[in-house]
């Protein structure tokens, strides 16, 4: 043992228990006024030597920037609040309750709006025969007016510098998803296409969030997501099996369902991209990006791929305006919730669209849901209500905000 280590005394503490004897050794460093204390220059505040090992450790703590956000290269274990901190959270439960309730009201409202869009899309397809790309074009032109909100909040319409590429990529993903979804509705029954679109969006958002940004979910959230997807499958699969088609129609419908899967994949990807830039891009800027990219895409493709028509009657224009209003409300609700919740959870709540669409079809179109539709809708409803009750429970309100911030790797 060298002389430098011998000058510090080693103290031994013995703790005697009825069954065991614990010995603990601790190093004692001389304090000011004691023998062996060396007076260092405390004013400088520099006590760490600059060595290659130190530089390597410091470099390991730096943050790595990726296309989808900023991710820690060394993930620190999530630490729960201390009991004193939990007491601090419990001192202000009313604000947490109001904020959480507001968030869930917005989510449920967006699900209702999505259900209205599904019904109106079917009505305009059956009665007005408006092609899907023209529908996207007209909807996007009306949503371009969201630039007024962007200018009102003094935000750059095309996003701040450093985020424009990701914002443009987000808009392209959204336009591709809507195009694939609306195109599939002309090949497969719109109800089946909408259901598969929602189910694949939920599954892909959970997978992509984990793979791209390392954002996981709690075990209770996973159970509710799986239960809701199971309910969606109960509604969708029997409807597909009952269809009797020829070989050519089978291949055509296979292409249609492939388009819905692509719509779900690109929708999930757009949600992940927005979640990585949500701190710098507002939902109004995101809506404007979606609208102008949709306008450019619809104007350049609807004359090449489809035969557009000119809506002349007031009924068609009322459907178009209703679709625009409902889709805008649903869009803002979903992307407002994305700033708080995991994308898979947001998509799971939107499964209520299927239940809302069933009720609206029964009231407006007099279409009775089948047995599997009722069972699947009940499973979806129970899963979403259980998820909402779990998130709004008193014991989780204190740590919900803290835990989501700690678990998220997007800063």
UniProtKB/Swiss-Prot annotation:
Transmembrane segments annotated in the record for this chain: 104-124, 130-150, 168-188, 193-213, 217-237, 254-274, 285-305, 318-338, 345-365, 367-387
Principal location listed in the UniProt entry: membrane
One annotated Gene Ontology cellular component of this protein: plasma membrane
Membrane topology reported for the UniProt record: Multi-pass membrane protein
Keyword field contains Amino-acid biosynthesis: no
Keywords: Cell membrane, Cytoplasmic vesicle, Membrane, Repeat, Synapse, Transmembrane, Transmembrane helix
Residue span, EamA domain: 112-237, 261-389
Protein's cellular compartments: Cell membrane; Cytoplasmic vesicle, Secretory vesicle, Synaptic vesicle membrane
Family to which this protein belongs: Belongs to the SLC35G solute transporter family.
Name under which the protein is recorded: Solute carrier family 35 member G2
């Amino acid at each position: 043992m060298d002389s430098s280590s011998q000058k510090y005394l080693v103290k031994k503490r013995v703790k005697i228990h009825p069954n065991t004897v614990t010995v603990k050794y601790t190093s004692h460093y001389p304090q000011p006024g004691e023998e062996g204390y060396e007076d260092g220059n405390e004013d400088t505040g520099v006590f760490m030597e600059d060595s290659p090992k130190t530089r390597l450790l410091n470099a390991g703590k730096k943050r790595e920037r990726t296309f989808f956000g900023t991710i820690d290269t060394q993930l620190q274990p999530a630490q729960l609040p201390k009991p004193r901190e939990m007491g601090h959270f419990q001192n202000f439960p009313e604000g947490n309750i109001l904020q959480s309730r507001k968030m869930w009201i917005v989510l449920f409202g967006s699900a209702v709006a999505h259900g209205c869009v599904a019904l109106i899309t079917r009505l305009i397809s059956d009665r007005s025969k408006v092609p899907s790309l023209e529908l996207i074009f007209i909807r996007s032109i009306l949503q371009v007016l969201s630039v007024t909100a962007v200018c009102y909040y003094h935000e750059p319409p095309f996003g701040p510098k450093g985020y424009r590429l990701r914002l443009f990529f987000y808009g392209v993903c959204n336009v591709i998803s809507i195009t694939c979804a609306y195109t599939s509705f002309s090949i497969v029954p719109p109800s089946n296409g909408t259901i598969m679109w929602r189910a694949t969006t939920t599954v892909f958002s959970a997978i992509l969030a984990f793979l791209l940004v390392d954002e996981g979910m709690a075990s209770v959230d996973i159970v509710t997501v799986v239960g809701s997807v199971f309910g969606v499958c109960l509604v969708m699969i029997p409807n597909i099996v009952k269809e009797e088609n020829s070989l050519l129609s089978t291949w055509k419908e296979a292409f249609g369902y492939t388009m819905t899967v692509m719509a779900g994949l690109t929708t999930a990807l757009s949600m992940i991209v927005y979640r990585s830039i949500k701190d710098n891009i507002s939902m109004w800027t995101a809506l404007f990006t979606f609208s102008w990219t949709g306008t450019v895409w619809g104007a350049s493709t609807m004359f090449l791929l489809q035969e557009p028509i000119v809506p002349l009657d007031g009924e068609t224009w009322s459907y178009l305006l209703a679709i625009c209003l409902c889709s805008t409300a649903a869009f803002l609700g979903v992307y407002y919730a994305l700033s708080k919740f995991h994308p898979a959870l947001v998509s799971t709540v939107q499964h209520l669209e299927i239940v809302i669409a069933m009720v609206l079809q029964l009231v407006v179109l007099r279409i009775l849901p089948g047995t599997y539709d009722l069972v699947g809708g009940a499973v979806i409803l129970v899963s979403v209500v259980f998820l909402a009750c779990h998130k709004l429970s008193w014991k989780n309100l204190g740590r919900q905000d803290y835990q989501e911030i700690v678990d998220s790797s997007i800063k």
